[in-house]
């Protein structure tokens, strides 16, 4: 038997963009909890923000399994709001973990300073920018191919050691895009950042809790996966009908859709897809499919002692030379040093507690999240390189592996750029600001990190998109709704 609810504004998704949209609508208008409803597929709120409980750690540490940093810290609205709201002590709750990396390869420590390797990396990145900016119509190349092109063109100016290491060191960008470098778009590989990256020691769970406290509990519906949106509804005096797999029908006047791009792009035949009636315009469907979804994961190892140089913030272990198809689906554990390693030293972040937080990229993320018991087997030979005096390293006393790629409602980490991808159409179409683009209904808006050109893939991007979508809905209500709701501020 179907159940029904009716509300003025419905928000699909209780991630940071959905929660911020709901909080914005409630705080900027005289709408109440009866007027705003947030429906979430999972049994928790937060979306891709997830902070562990200390009970999951043998060392009493809270880990962010999703986003961990305040990126673009000079212009980060979330950082500023959390400090202004008293949620963050900028002296003890955050840490700039950007001391120069200590880098290793399978043969030992990499001579970063003596061989001027970072200077060559800077040159490679500048070459990539110049190549695509000077030739706006030039076909895209993968990061691997554009780096190879650089070495071919400037081989005469590069030393043997720089040739040996620098190409492999450029694979650090895999930890930004969540995919291997043979798939990363060269055109979008090098970006400009608005400030340093500030590690959130306290955890983003506090942001989620703070937003949720400003939304009535009755306005949050969990474990209700949406499977249909009827955007031209004629029943119950409401313009939109949303249905869930559990048989719940929700009628609303305004809708904000915040599900990840990975869900929007699913074929209708998938049991986790959302069916639209009428179907979305073909151009919008094409724009949704014009980008992809990355798989940045984490493997956390806790030990009974620190065996690495605890004066360092982070470690990088570069991969061996590999010419194969790095992006293919893994059916067995790859050899160590096939994919690079990036580790954050939580021993320095948390006062001597022996913990390393390792970032992973697709397809390794997908494999390890499916086979978490094999994580140590892959990383142990690589982490051995960090050992002081080359003493045998201990086995971990605790291992935590993320599960983002196995979560059917998320399916990865955040939007990313494959070679030949272009995010501009998607961002323009989902904004709803341009006539004949996106969908024609002004009472339906989209939000999420994939809908914005500022802070794409980041918490502050999702947060700002929630504010923007909410403001658009409120403006529409104020302009057109006969009930005459007032907007505050």
Swiss-Prot record:
Pfam families: Amino_oxidase. One of its GO terms (molecular function) is steroid binding. Keywords: Lipid-binding, Steroid-binding. InterPro entries: Amino_oxidase (IPR002937), FAD/NAD-bd_sf (IPR036188), Flavin_monoamine_oxidase (IPR050281). It comes from the Eukaryota. The keyword NAD does not apply. The keyword Ion transport does not apply. Disulfide bonds: none annotated. One of its GO terms (cellular component) is fungal biofilm matrix. GO terms for biological process: pantothenate biosynthetic process; spermine catabolic process. May be a flavoprotein with enzymatic activity. To yeast FMS1. PANTHER family: FLAVIN MONOAMINE OXIDASE, LYSINE-SPECIFIC HISTONE DEMETHYLASE 2. This is Corticosteroid-binding protein. It comes from Candida albicans (strain SC5314 / ATCC MYA-2876).
